[in-house]
Structures are given as C-alpha cells and as structure tokens.
C-alpha cells in the first residue's frame, strides 16, 4: 500500500487503560505509522465509568456506553483525535458529531470456553458454575445446558480468566479475539462458534471514531477500513438499533460475505444470522437472511422485522424489566 502524504505531525488516540484496550490502540497506531511514514501517533489513556466500577453489575451502573462515553467526549472536546473501541461495547446511537470512520479487518468472532478440568461445555457436570458478564452468553449457556449455574463476573480479561485457572469457577467464557490478541488463547479448551453459539453484535471487530468535520483524520484512517468487515458490522448494528437494544441485551448476530455454494446462495451476498434470547435461556427467536452486499442497512432492517414477527419483543421486554 502506498503511503499518504500527511500535513499533521501528531495524531492522538484515546484508549481505555486495560491491557487489551492498549494492545488494540497500539495495533491501530502501528497500522497508521505504516500507512503514513512520518506521522507521530501517541496514546492517551482515558478512564471510563466501566473501568472505575469493576464490582457492580453492568446494567446496575448504566448499561450502554460504560466503556465508551468518556472517550467519545474526549474526541468531541479535542483532547484526542480518534477513539479506538471494541465494537461490541459501542452503542448504536452516538453523538452526531462523531463518525465511525474505519473498521479494520475482523478477528475470529467465536466465544471461548476455559474449563481446565472438564474441557468442554458438554462434559461439565450438572451444577457446574460458569462465569460470564454477558446476558447473551448466559442465555445461550442456559439454553444449551439448563442444568448448570451461571455466575456473574467482572474485571479485565486476565482477572476473569484466572477465575477458571485458579479453580474458583468450573469454567469461564470470554471472547476468543481478546484472548488471541493478548496471546492467552492457549488456555482455551473449547471454541464456541457460530452458528451453534452466536457472537455479540460487533464481536471481534474494532471501531475507530473521529470528528465528522475532521477531514484530515478521516483521510488518515481510510486505509485501515476493511469493506467486508464494515458492511457486516453495519448489518449487525442496524438490527440491534432497530430492536432498540443495547450491548447488554441477550441478542446475538453474525454477518459475513458469502458466495455461491451447494445450497444455491447467490454470489455477492451478505448473510446475517441473528437471535434474541430470554434472559434465562428458556426461549429464543432466531432467523437467517441474505441480501446484496451493497445494502447492509436494509438487511439489518429486514432482520429486525423478522425477529419481531417471530416474537422477539416479549423476550426483550423481560430483559428490560430485569435490568431496570
């Protein structure tokens, strides 16, 4: 890729202070340095509400935006030039003055089970305790294994991983992408992958925000954008937005490009699997749709309508009642 001439000498990246967040921000910084020789990229650590309170349930301290609002505010105030987010944490409704300028290529979307003794979800004895902070994971776990117990855990990746490694819990579930980025994937005993175990909206992807009117920064970010990932994310996030859900509801979605196969799918299509779960895994509504790659928003809108037609709204309402 040819380098782009630059006018700015320094670009400031706003990031959370966790090891994973800093890894992700540094990865973006290195990509920018490679695309734009001479650009000085610096990281600015910003503490978010979700980082400050590591004990309360996420829903109890405000739900959506807990890991993003302060960083977005820093961009708006001109304290930093861009924000790097884990897209699964980024609310679908944000400040109009910000734009999701780049979505780099996506990591593996799978979840990961760490069960040092029993190895797999199927082998865990009845009554086993599995730790997670996600209602989506909780719902799918209880749907697959109603005889296990789900414990709510908080903290950074290493803290949650150690709950299983130290035997405090029988297993924990984390995102494969985060473990891989931190070179901790050796501890994974089972990948929980789609279509059997669906990921969160945006899981495995990073999102880079900047100010809408900052055309210089938008030009710098353009080489980092991956079109297949960006359109997949757009389809998933449109579905979530139309269902008026946040990152805490038990909803899963997985979009990806597909080509012609033995099932007769048309070339150049975008496929989207999505599901909404009862918080306790007793019921769920799921659908699979395809549409033109050129219109991921429309695919997301169609998916939201399909899930509502299948009975998703009562399941979402149960979640809202539990988290308010």
Cite the ranges covered by each PLM segment.
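Alpha-helical segments flanking ligand/cofactor-binding loops in enzyme cores
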Residues: 73, 121-122, 162
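Short, well-ordered beta-strand segments
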Residues: 12-14, 83, 101, 131, ...
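Short, structured active-site "lid" loops
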Residues: 56-82
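A conserved helix-loop-strand patch within extracytoplasmic ligand-binding domains
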Residues: 87-90, 96-148
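Short, Asp-centered acidic motifs that coordinate Mg2+ and/or phosphate
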Residues: 80-84, 170-171
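Small-molecule-sensing regulatory modules
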Residues: 2-53, 60, 68, 143-324
């Amino acid at each position: 890729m040819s380098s782009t001439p630059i006018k700015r000498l320094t670009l400031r990246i706003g990031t959370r202070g966790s090891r994973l967040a800093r890894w992700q921000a540094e990865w973006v910084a290195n990509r920018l340095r490679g695309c734009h020789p001479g650009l000085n990229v610096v990281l600015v650590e910003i503490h978010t509400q979700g980082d400050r309170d590591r004990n309360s349930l996420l829903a109890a301290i405000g739900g959506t935006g807990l890991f993003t609002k302060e960083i977005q505010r820093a961009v708006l105030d001109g304290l930093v030039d861009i924000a790097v987010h884990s897209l699964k944490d980024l609310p679908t409704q944000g400040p109009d003055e910000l734009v999701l300028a780049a979505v780099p290529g996506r990591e593996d979307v799978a979840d990961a089970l760490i069960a040092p003794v029993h190895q797999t979800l199927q082998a865990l004895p009845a009554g086993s305790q599995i730790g997670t902070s996600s209602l989506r994971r909780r719902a799918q776990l209880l749907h697959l294994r109603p005889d296990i117990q789900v414990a709510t855990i908080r903290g950074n990746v290493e803290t949650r991983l150690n709950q299983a490694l130290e035997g405090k819990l029988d297993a924990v579930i984390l995102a494969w992408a985060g473990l891989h980025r931190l070179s901790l994937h050796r501890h994974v005993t089972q990948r929980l992958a789609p279509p059997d175990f669906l990921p969160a909206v945006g899981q495995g992807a990073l999102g880079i925000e900047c100010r809408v009117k900052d055309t210089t920064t938008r030009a710098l970010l353009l080489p980092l954008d991956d079109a297949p990932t960006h359109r997949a994310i757009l389809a998933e996030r449109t579905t979530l937005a139309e269902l008026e859900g946040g990152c805490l509801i038990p909803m899963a979605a997985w979009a990806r490009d597909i080509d012609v196969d033995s099932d007769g799918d048309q070339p150049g299509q975008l496929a989207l699997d999505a599901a909404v779960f009862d918080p306790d895994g007793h019921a769920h509504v799921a659908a699979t749709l395809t549409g033109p790659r050129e219109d991921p928003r429309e695919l997301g809108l169609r998916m939201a309508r399909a899930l509502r037609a299948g009975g998703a709204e009562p399941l979402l309402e149960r979640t809202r009642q539990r988290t308010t």
